[in-house]
């Protein structure tokens, strides 16, 4: 996969040189470049922003530098993701779809956002990572890159490492425990020490259902529930 990022702050992306994403870059599983679109400004002062027509607070990113930076990529039908608080909420399903793409381009917003023509002519996806406003799209882009790259085949050591993640099944993930079995009187649930895989799977399913019910009940509307699941959830409501 190839990922290009158009940003005013390419130096922020050094964080992606570490951990799983950094290893994927080193192994050639993903190729990344970070273009400062200020370098493409034809303004003598290299300005990339201007006042909005019709008035209003703040400054907008102008089309010229971003269009020219984008076309310098000579990309063939990439998926172009524009970061904006008005976009669709990013989720695990998006990451799963994007992980199958050959080429992703991220446009990092700043100031009061982009001139609408950038939205209309360049973006294939307008995406937000939550109901809050950041100073720029760089952190949001790093979040989305991390969530996507880890799903590329062979990036994680084991496929199951992400197949059981929260949201991959539609439910929040169950609790995890490791050694020691008793830490200062805090013990691991007996079922996990039983060696009975059927009981362990049933326990994990119930834990996922309960955690989702108590923390993100909205997710249950989109999960295919068995009769056993429904009975367990009803017991929580009672």
Curated annotation (Swiss-Prot):
Example of a GO MF term: tRNA (guanine(37)-N1)-methyltransferase activity
Matching InterPro entries: Alpha/beta_knot_MTases, tRNA_m1G_MeTrfase_C_sf, tRNA_m1G_MeTrfase_TrmD, tRNA_m1G_MTases_N, tRNA_MeTrfase_TRMD/TRM10
Cleaved signal peptide residues: none
Keywords assigned: Cytoplasm, Methyltransferase, S-adenosyl-L-methionine, Transferase, tRNA processing
Annotated Pfam families: tRNA_m1G_MT
Function: Specifically methylates guanosine-37 in various tRNAs.
Assembly information from the UniProt record: Homodimer.
Name this protein carries in UniProt: tRNA (guanine-N(1)-)-methyltransferase
Organism of provenance: Exiguobacterium sp. (strain ATCC BAA-1283 / AT1b)
Classification of source organism: Bacteria, Bacillati, Bacillota, Bacilli, Bacillales
Gene from which the chain derives: trmD
